[in-house]
From Swiss-Prot:
The gene is prmC. GO terms for molecular function: nucleic acid binding; protein-(glutamine-N5) methyltransferase activity; protein-glutamine N-methyltransferase activity. GO terms for biological process: methylation; translational termination. Belongs to the protein N5-glutamine methyltransferase family. PrmC subfamily. It catalyses: L-glutaminyl-[peptide chain release factor] + S-adenosyl-L-methionine = N(5)-methyl-L-glutaminyl-[peptide chain release factor] + S-adenosyl-L-homocysteine + H(+). Methylates the class 1 translation termination release factors RF1/PrfA and RF2/PrfB on the glutamine residue of the universally conserved GGQ motif. It comes from Geobacter sulfurreducens (strain ATCC 51573 / DSM 12127 / PCA). Keywords: Methyltransferase, S-adenosyl-L-methionine, Transferase. Disulfide bonds: none annotated. The keyword Ligase does not apply. This is Release factor glutamine methyltransferase.
Amino acid sequence: MTEKPEIWTIRKVLDWTRGYLAEKGVENARLETEWLLSAALGLDRVGLYVNFDKPLNPEELAACRGLVARRAKREPLQYILGTQEFCGLDFVVTPSVLIPRHDTEVIVEEALRRAPHAAAVLDIGVGSGCIAVALAKQLPHAQVVGVEQSPGAIALAQRNAERHGARVTLFEGSLFEPLGDQRFDLIVSNPPYIPTADLEALQPEVREYEPRAALDGGSDGLDFYRLIVPAAPEYLNPGGWLMVELGIGQAETVLGMFSRTGFCDCFTAQDPNGIDRVVGGRIG
């Protein structure tokens, strides 16, 4: 007699995948399993449980295996699914850009709180476009400009701007280089801020998959602040704000840069974990 082929129901695949990903060191293995299987099967997460006992056909199993194998190699879930939510908007993400973090929403919140009438906004290092697009959606009458060195990131930011109907003008280049004599009421930036020596200790998802150029901030993580902060006043209108995201333990040093450059009303803002995540100041 020939043995009957093993039947894999959604319940069985969920249980097996959850354990497998946990063994591979994936945090939140249960939740990520649900997202992966939802994507593979074209169901929402409720649909998985409604169809708990549904047997999967070979094509469905192959689709599940393909996504699970990628995650088991610690490829970020966001790259596998192709999107990440930020400020209530879904952004397309690829390995050409840093994955938007919820901590970065703090800089958007502070910008809207402190510069709600900004008519000209600049995002330095636009990446996926998440900050620029989020601000453009909340400041529909503002001229929002983004600068980015990576051609791949520029293309993706343009795609995300179009996806959300946001008016964002993008320039390829380094920092302030492409801007000529333009001036702004608000400049924001989430520059690379991880010290080079710390990169190897990052989680595999970050170390192996996200673009190193978007992470590496030089020997002490502060290289880009030394370039951005002193140059920013030349590109700010009177009363204009500069706000930057930063890493753990960097706020005091960056605040010093702001003060020495002549910024006033300097502040720090914390992320949901109580970590100083944004430093900002205003040109008088």
